[in-house]
Amino acid sequence: MSKSQEQRLQNFVTVIQGLNDILDDKMDEATEKFKSGNSSFHLSGQAVVAFIQAVLTFEPSRFKDSQNRIDIAIKALSADKDDASKNNTFLSTFDPGVEYRVSIGLMLLLSALIGFCSESIVTSVKSVYKLRKAHSIFSKINKRHFDHFSAAFHSTGRSDVDLANEYVQTGTLLCTGLFTLLISLLPPKMITILNVFGYKGDRDWALQCMWMPALQRPTSFFAAVAFAALIQYYSGAVQLCSIYKKTPEEPDGWPDKRCFEILEKVEKAHPDGPMWPLHRAKLLSMVKKQDEAIVVLEELMAKPPPRLKQLEVLIVFEHALDCAFSHRYVDGANSFLKLSSLNDSSTALYSYFAAACFLQDVHVNANVEALEKASKLLEPLHDLVANKTAPLDVHIRRKVGKLIKRRASAGNQGGLAEYVGFSPLYELVYVWNGFRRMTDDELSKFDVERMEPWQDQDDDICQALIKATVLRNLGRTDEVFPILQKICAVTRTTETWAVAFAHYEMAVAFFESNGSKKEGLKHCDAYLRKARDFGGDNEFESRLIIRVQLARHVVRKCLQSMS
């Protein structure tokens, strides 16, 4: 290699080391490395840090700074890419300049995400254009090298060149897979439009692309990020859906054994990163070991907070959910209250969730003090979300507004918590599909027969939905059909979401009871389509659509295997 090539490669290695520092929550060390030079790679590292800071704070000034740094990095990368191509300069064993193309593609993706976070239609349109450019870059690289990428990683004998090869290979696979996976999760109509522009949403291929780097080079930066994204997908979208194909490798619809094996390798490579114990807790919760998950999270919470503030938010939120799911109501409430101090942008949700936990503790443990705490949290919520349009804010406004009217009809006596009908915590557990993470013992603790003094017919619908879901998760699927049929027949209710989800639950029941036969699958698909097209004033429609899309993907594959 020439002296110029060696210097470029050294700059590249320094920046990769900085990126790995980020995975260990060593932001100061990473920033120092990125500022140690002014090469296009150093500028890219600075842009990544600025992007992370912008996303975590959501401050307009940081978004602007991030965009400026990305623009500067892209300009420098483009110049170096052209120079490498012109002078046939290799850093890896792939094409001259390919490292710069991967970096440009990554910068374009980050820039597009920033644009989508803005409220400007013009900026959003520009973001679509940037996505298209990034998509084109990675498509060209894949067309030329995908067969090589999909094979085992081979060492060249030089660690720096191996690092460059690793960057190109894992970076391309991650960006390609993540881009394709996100498209596959969009609403069907939007996918149809994007297909016109050449975007394809093949979910199976996307997951394959993301698993390749995680399996080949699990400790590398892009591979670790790919693995983290996979865990987020499995713990988020996949856990929301109760229709999945069971195989020896994926007994619960996702590769649990493989995930734990890769996580162990990543944890050894990044022992100081709080992100990885958080992901261990997620996996433990997904395999119905919530007690173990809570221990991991509480060990994390006892340590000094991560330098990345958003990581602390994610850790505490996971702890709050696991406590709520495992009937530790006061612990869950306290974690939700802590979240309010860490992230004031979602105060209403955290306060409502905390109030729901306190109220459940009143019902189960006769905790009179918790009733007062619940009322105190509920009082300001209606005004707090008065002008907000996010689905959960709309749900909270409607629910609290109903309590205010009930209290007014009783002469405005007492706290709002005294006028709650069916358990709001049970409803929130359903929205997050926490029932899927529970053991039979945890499920059996849900009192789905309890009637409250202020409970009305709308509350009855929600209670029936939760009862059917608990019974199904306990394996008593035959008992849920008459319950769900009664809900599906409802034509007028303020709890539209519950009726829409009842159609989805009917599909799940058909899949579990008769999913091995074509007739059962057709009934299942029919109810999934009814759920998708239900419409109405459903605050949780986006969550329903995600479940339906994932479910129909499974059902269609089952039907294809029978034809």
Curated annotation (Swiss-Prot):
Q: Which Pfam families match?
A: Iml2-TPR_39
Q: List the disulfide bonds.
A: none
| Keyword Iron among record annotations | no
The coiled-coil segments of this chain are none
Keywords for this protein: Cytoplasm, Nucleus, Phosphoprotein
GO biological process, alphabetically ordered: cellular detoxification; cellular response to misfolded protein
Q: What is its main location?
A: cytoplasm
Residue intervals passing through the bilayer: none
Q: Does the keyword Signal apply?
A: no
Where does the record say this protein resides?
Cytoplasm; Nucleus
| A Gene Ontology term for the protein's cellular component | nucleus
What is the annotated quaternary arrangement, including any partners? Interacts with lipid droplet proteins.
Biological function: Inclusion body (IB) resident protein that interacts strongly with lipid droplet (LD) proteins. Involved in LD-mediated IB clearing after protein folding stress, probably by enabling access to the IBs of an LD-stored soluble sterol derivative that acts as a chaperone in inclusion clearing.
Sequence similarity? Belongs to the IML2 family.
The protein's name is: Inclusion body clearance protein IML2
Species of provenance: Schizosaccharomyces pombe (strain 972 / ATCC 24843)
